[in-house]
């Protein structure tokens, strides 16, 4: 009697899961060193308890936990007056109304920040890199920057309205 040798098996489910786990681990490690600088590098510093006292729940969620508000939920998306948009966490002037435009996304959008007002880092939270924008004075999360904005920069700073305060001129 001759024995039939089995054909080589396709990669097992277990092997596929191992590869998936390895890739996930690599993505996590890649993201670890790419966030905002440590709080010690910022001009404005508070403890977590102090931030919780200073900010509303929604501001804390956006600014300190890098959350995102619902589109079209902020009245600042439709703000048309001349003035300055400042950080709701520390009052740092971030954007001029001269750089604001209607992106149609439902979030306040700007083609540039005031000089030195914001910093950026790479955010991998949704599986691919995005440019996160944060307050340069303490690192609070503001939103993200995309490459689909108008001239002169071609950038769209898509900002959570709850992270902003508006000061009319």
Where are the regions that the model predicts?
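N-terminal post-signal-peptidase region of extra-cytosolic proteins
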Residues: 63-80
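C-terminal segment of N-terminal export signals and the immediately downstream linker at the start
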Residues: 30-62, 70
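N-terminal secretory signal peptides
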Residues: 1-11, 22-26
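Short, non-ligating residues that shape and space the ligands of small metal-coordination modules
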Residues: 96-97, 144-145, 167
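Cys/His-coordinated zinc-binding microdomains
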Residues: 91, 139, 162
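Residues immediately within or flanking Cys/His clusters that coordinate Zn2+
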Residues: 84, 132, 155
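Mid-length scaffold segments of soluble, non-membrane domains
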Residues: 80-109
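Short cysteine-rich clusters marking metal-coordination/redox-active sites
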Residues: 87, 135-138
């Amino acid at each position: 009697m001759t024995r039939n040798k089995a054909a080589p098996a396709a990669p097992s489910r277990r092997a596929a899961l191992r590869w998936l786990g390895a890739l996930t681990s690599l993505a996590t490690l890649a993201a670890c060193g790419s966030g905002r600088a440590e709080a010690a590098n910022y001009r404005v510093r508070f403890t977590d308890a102090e931030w919780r006292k200073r900010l509303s729940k929604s501001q804390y969620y956006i600014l300190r936990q890098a959350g995102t508000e619902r589109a079209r939920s902020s009245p600042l998306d439709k703000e048309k007056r001349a003035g300055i948009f400042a950080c709701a966490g520390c009052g740092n002037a971030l954007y001029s109304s001269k750089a604001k435009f209607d992106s149609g996304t439902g979030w306040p959008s700007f083609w540039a920040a005031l000089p030195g007002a914001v910093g950026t880092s790479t955010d991998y939270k949704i599986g691919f890199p995005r440019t996160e924008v944060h307050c340069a004075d303490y690192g609070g999360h503001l939103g993200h920057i995309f490459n689909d904005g108008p001239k002169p920069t071609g950038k769209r700073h898509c900002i959570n309205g709850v992270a902003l305060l508006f000061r009319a001129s």
